[in-house]
Amino acid sequence: MNTKTQELTRAELEIMQILWRLEKGFVNDILEAMPAPKLAYNTVSTIVRILEKKGFVEHRAYGKSHEYYPLILREEYTSRFMTGVLNSFFGGSIGNMVSFLSHDKGITVSEADEIIKMLQNKK
């Protein structure tokens, strides 16, 4: 499947976050890295297989064990996801998004200054 059009569920994203951090791992490694309450082994195993079908992870087989690793970078997924949010909720306008964040989430002056500096450095 094409990861460009796929979104991750909350559970899938949690497992991808772990795999991005670990770079690779068996189901037990993923479980060990999970915060409590941990999902069941079979649940994690099912989710990584779904991620594989979606094209987000691949595995290396060692007998009956599978070591999973991400096929997409965290930054790449984040960029696609945020572009989708920007287009779906803010009409593609970064200004509208920042305005929403400043009113709804109370962006601080120092955070606004950081954004301005980032924009100035892009020129």
Regions found by a protein language model. Give the residues of each.
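Short acidic, hydrophobic short linear motifs in intrinsically disordered regions
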Residues: 24-34
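Glycine-centered, phosphate/nucleic-acid-interacting loop/turn motifs that mediate DNA/RNA or nucleotide
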Residues: 55
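Short beta-strand "wing" residues that participate in macromolecule-binding interfaces
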Residues: 58-59
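Amphipathic alpha-helical dimerization/coiled-coil segments
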Residues: 80-121
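Pre-recognition alpha-helix immediately N-terminal to the DNA-recognition helix
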Residues: 13-18, 29, 96
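Short helix-to-turn junction characteristic of helix-turn-helix DNA-binding domains
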Residues: 19-23
